């Protein structure tokens, strides 16, 4: 029980004091004069100049009031002092009224330890469980606060924004990789089968052709150095790749990609792109039977480059809320996806800076591979530029979907081209050996014919090599093999994967999808935070007066010292450990009051 003096003077009994001895709320003052003025302005129920307190020994302090109990029904608070000893005011809760007789009422009370000792105790750094905190910085950016509140926020999100970002808008690249060069460099003579080893990130022997195009089948205007190149349509490019003699069976990979690993200069409105002539050259693939194909040949790339896409303010599109914490994860989340099975979730509060920037990396490899990472995500401010770049790779979306274009292997053309001279030599050999057989040189000549035959001569297998008739059968067998090859359908040696589905449905680049919890839960959590602040879990000085209207404070084993009796001091500690709202404005208990940071 709190300490109670033996007697009091200037006893004043009030009504309409808006807090009680449960200590859920109290009025907080900056000085004793403001405190006295607040209570003294409350409606007075009764005044006693001087009285003795009874029941102190039993722990039930009360005073006898010469007033009917009906006249005291609304009495809820009392203040007094003892002018014989000091001018200190004691503040008390009226706890009970007891009928004595028609003109006398016992009024029971207990000391309000918070108001009585408000200016006699002070906090030391204490473990703060929860309190009202600063929510926004000087630039009106939400301060990071991600401590779990332990509250239900639902199981579903509302999608509030979806934006698609492509490295070069509608521009795409078809990458064709061949075993050898398919064109002649200006001023040189074309040599079929020439291996043109070069640097493509690393030394390698393949030849790379890059063919830019749009989804409508057109191509951009291309400038390489100071030379303009009119690139062929992608359909013309493909048609000729599988008909020209030195291109058929030369192609080892063919795929479509959004980014070739180089931050090229591209004007989307003018549909023009510029390439460095140190890296690329104009390639004209031609033979004497088919139209020329204009495309771009990769000369050399020593190091690839990233491209940065600025998607705008990282908290844009989320519902406005006075509680900054509701912009944090898990209440808000940004998903980056390509809708091809590759996805990362971003906690916006851990993106350094105001804007969400996506870094795109790629290459001209044997298959598609493009990565999308968030710039300066979870990167400490002490990291350097290169270290920041590396750190961002730690959280990346990697699109290594093949995006292949089907490669047709024309078996007939391949066989005829690769074995044309051999076939003619086999025919001559068979005829010669057939004649020699008739002259008696049979089995040795037939054995050489069998050795040179790609088909396997029937007579060779059975040992029948005795006449020119057998030679005719061999030639017929070889021609039948050629006919069989001609009747074989073209084979797909590299399937196209889901390229048609992905690109035909517009699934290119990445999508930035912003999601937040349902409005129902936003309102619940907002109301809770407005009333009780945020979890803090820090050892610090509590925020006792940092808001316009009220501060909630809850501690654990709080460290309070003061010039007062130990019993009351311990009770004050218990009150703050239980949590209390300190009101700075009236009406106390009105949580609709403006409660911005002071």
Swiss-Prot record:
Compartments in which it is found: Virion
GO cellular component, one term: virus tail, tube
InterPro entries, per database record: Gp9_C (IPR048710), Gp9_N (IPR031772)
Any Gene Ontology biological process: symbiont genome ejection through host cell envelope, short tail mechanism
Keywords, alphabetical: Late protein, Pore-mediated penetration of viral genome into host cell, Viral genome ejection through host cell envelope, Viral penetration into host cytoplasm, Viral short tail ejection system, Viral tail protein, Viral tail tube protein, Virion, Virus entry into host cell
Superkingdom of origin organism: Viruses
Pfam name, any one: Caud_tail_N
Principal location listed in the UniProt entry: virion
Family according to the record: Belongs to the picovirinae distal tube protein family.
Quaternary structure annotation from Swiss-Prot or TrEMBL: Homohexamer; forms a hexameric tube structure with six flexible hydrophobic loops.
Summary of the function given for this chain in its UniProt record: Distal (knob) tail protein that plugs the end of the tube before DNA ejection and forms a channel perforating the host membrane during ejection.
Protein name, UniProt field: Tail knob protein gp9
């Amino acid at each position: 029980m709190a300490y109670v003096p033996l007697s009091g003077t200037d006893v004043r009994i009030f009504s309409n004091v808006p807090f009680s001895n449960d200590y859920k709320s109290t009025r907080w003052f900056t000085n004793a004069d403001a405190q006295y003025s607040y209570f003294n302005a409350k409606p007075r129920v009764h005044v006693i100049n001087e009285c003795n307190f009874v029941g102190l020994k039993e722990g039930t302090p009360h005073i006898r009031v010469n007033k009917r109990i009906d006249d005291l029904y609304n009495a809820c608070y009392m203040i007094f002092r003892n002018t014989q000893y000091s001018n200190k005011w004691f503040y008390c809760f009226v706890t009970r009224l007891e009928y004595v007789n028609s003109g006398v009422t016992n009024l029971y009370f207990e000391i309000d330890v918070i108001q009585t000792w408000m200016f006699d105790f002070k906090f030391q750094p204490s473990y703060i469980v929860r309190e009202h905190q600063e929510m926004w910085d000087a630039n009106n950016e939400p301060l990071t606060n991600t401590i779990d509140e332990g509250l239900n926020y639902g199981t579903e999100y509302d999608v509030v924004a979806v934006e698609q970002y492509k490295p070069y808008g509608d521009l795409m690249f078809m990458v064709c990789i061949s075993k050898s060069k398919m064109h002649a460099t200006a001023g040189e003579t074309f040599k079929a089968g020439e291996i043109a080893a070069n640097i493509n990130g690393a030394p390698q022997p393949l030849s790379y052709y890059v063919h830019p195009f749009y989804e409508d089948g057109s191509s951009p205007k291309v400038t390489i150095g100071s030379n303009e190149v009119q690139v062929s349509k992608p359909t013309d490019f493909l048609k000729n790749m599988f008909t020209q003699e030195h291109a058929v069976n030369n192609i080892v990979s063919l795929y479509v990609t959004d980014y070739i690993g180089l931050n090229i200069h591209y004007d989307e409105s003018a549909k023009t792109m510029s390439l460095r002539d140190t890296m690329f050259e104009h390639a004209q693939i031609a033979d004497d039977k088919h139209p020329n194909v204009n495309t771009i040949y990769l000369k050399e790339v020593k190091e690839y480059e990233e491209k940065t896409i600025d998607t705008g303010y990282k908290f844009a599109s989320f519902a406005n809320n006075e509680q900054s914490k509701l912009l944090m994860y898990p209440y808000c989340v940004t998903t980056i996806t390509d809708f091809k099975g590759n996805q990362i979730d971003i906690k916006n509060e851990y993106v350094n800076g105001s804007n969400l920037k996506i870094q795109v990396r790629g290459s001209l490899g044997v298959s598609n591979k493009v990565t999308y990472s968030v710039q300066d995500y979870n990167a400490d401010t002490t990291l350097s530029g290169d270290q920041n770049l590396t750190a961002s790779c730690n959280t990346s979306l990697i699109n290594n979907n093949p995006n292949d274009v089907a490669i047709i292997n024309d078996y007939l053309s391949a066989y005829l081209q690769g074995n044309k001279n051999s076939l003619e030599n086999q025919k001559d050999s068979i005829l010669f050996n057939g004649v020699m057989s008739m002259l008696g040189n049979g089995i040795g000549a037939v054995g050489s014919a069998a050795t040179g035959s790609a088909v396997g001569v029937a007579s060779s297998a059975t040992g029948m090599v005795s006449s020119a008739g057998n030679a005719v059968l061999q030639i017929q067998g070889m021609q039948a093999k050629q006919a069989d090859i001609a009747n074989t359908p073209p084979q797909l040696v590299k399937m196209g994967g889901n390229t048609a589905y992905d690109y035909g449905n517009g699934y290119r680049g990445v999508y930035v999808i912003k999601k937040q919890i349902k409005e129902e839960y936003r309102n619940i959590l907002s109301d809770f935070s407005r009333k009780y602040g945020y979890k803090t879990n820090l050892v610090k000085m509590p925020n006792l007066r940092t808001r316009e209207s009220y501060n909630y404070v809850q501690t654990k084993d709080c460290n309070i010292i003061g010039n007062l009796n130990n019993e009351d001091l311990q009770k004050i500690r218990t009150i703050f450990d239980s949590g209390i709202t300190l009101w700075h404005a009236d009406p106390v208990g009105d949580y609709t009051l403006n409660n911005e940071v002071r």
